[in-house]
Amino acid sequence: MKYVFPTSKVKRYRFPTHINDLVVDRADSQTSEVFIVVLGPGEAPPLHQHDDTEQVFYILAGAGTLSIGAKRKKYPVRPGDVVRIPPKTLHSIQCAGKKPLRYVAIDCFVAGRPAAEPTWDSHVKVLCAQQGWAYAQVVKRSK
């Protein structure tokens, strides 16, 4: 069992809208996964929700705007802020500055690891299919 996960050894996934550097794969955990999100100026993932996941973000660097709910209520975020996204909550976060927005994202699976997507790669394949993104172009294994 692993207890320490160096952030210098991550798997990089470059989506069309953002980067996820996987630190702890859900396959290596019972109820969570951890990644570092990097958004360039103006970048934001699509508004989305997770039915089985509560998310916690810790803002490391940059400035951003968190959008919550169908009405997209806006909240500014900056380094040191902690964000909590309950399950089934529409959300997105956009880089609002001239420098990248970086934050640690912790996914907490309230009912345990999702059986249909037991690894981060399996989740990425589903996400790519939903968004019309090419999985092979998203996956970048080196930082």
What residues fall within each predicted segment?
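A short beta-strand-loop-beta hairpin characteristic of the jelly-roll/cupin
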Residues: E54-P79, T89
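Ligand-binding loop in jelly-roll beta-barrel domains
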Residues: R78-P79, P87-P114
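A short, N-terminal "cap"/entry segment at the start of jelly-roll beta-barrel domains
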Residues: M1-E33, P46, P114, P118-K143
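Residue-level recognition of conserved beta-strand positions in structured domain cores
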Residues: I36, Q49, L60, I68-A70, ...
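Short, charged/polar surface micro-motifs in flexible loops or helix N-caps
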Residues: D28-T31, L39-E43, A63-T65, R72, ...
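A generic "binding-loop/recognition-motif" signal
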Residues: I19, E43, D52-T53, K71, ...
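Conserved short histidine dyad/triad with adjacent acidic residue
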Residues: F35-D51
